[in-house]
């Protein structure tokens, strides 16, 4: 606000993520947002984290270009989802991860290879893959026999681990790391590299680096191919959903494919999905890299879209009773946290997430099951 030259009293509302996520983390943001809203008597706009990832493409690409409906591929460390977005708060889940998300697979593979993951495992592995031969290892493309839009990376991760153990001889177990760890230091994959490469000739170290690059490139080829195949099918499924009503065949169509989330910053992912979009006759929209990872801009933009539709809550009272600090029996009226909050109803052809299949504690979807195509389009926002 200081950099923008805007005072808190000038704000029209405050948007804040209320789910999904860890309750402790969500609460920090919600409490701060409520304080500002209560102090300045302005509305608070609850935002779904994954919807924010998808909607920010409308800020990046322009609302005239990224019109509803569009297909969104949300790829991050914790999520892989293919979403038909028909409007603000109107989403159909066509596919999601059955176990591990792509971002997690990138991170774990980078660690297996002993890369420096201080700047993120994904960027480190992508940089190494440029030096490798993507055809050196025939890693399996996941779920090719399942004709749906779901994702799975657990099997691919296992194949990579076996290749690393076979061809790089990385020691197993914490005991192998302790020889190069300082007292009390947590063992990390790079310690295995130090231990294994100790005493090697320069030629051997170089050959070892080439093997790592080949594994990285081959992993990336299989991982991204999985994204390609699922996205191609999702384009078809989205068309089915949009035209499933009697007399609607051919009446509705996608405006574009949106790729968002942290992994969307990967250049190989963007290049591959550009080809998928081109084959489908659709533009591909990817937010700038700085808006692909978790950021405040995407939450603010989702707030703008929801506020324009009247999807906001009244300013919260500072405290109900007590002296205002909440420590003497006063109770605060708080915006509910929704740590387990599905983005929308699930297409009947989608398998769904087995990793989080328990229904206990699950909030109602942002988009109710059986919901009609949304009329929630803000005035002036196509």
Set out the residue ranges of the language-model regions.
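Short beta-strand-loop/turn "lid" adjacent to the catalytic site in phosphate-handling enzymes
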Residues: 1-34
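Conserved phosphate-binding catalytic cores of ATP/NTP-utilizing and phosphoryl-transfer enzymes
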Residues: 42, 46-71, 302
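Activation-segment/catalytic-loop signature of the eukaryotic protein kinase fold
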Residues: 212-224, 228-231
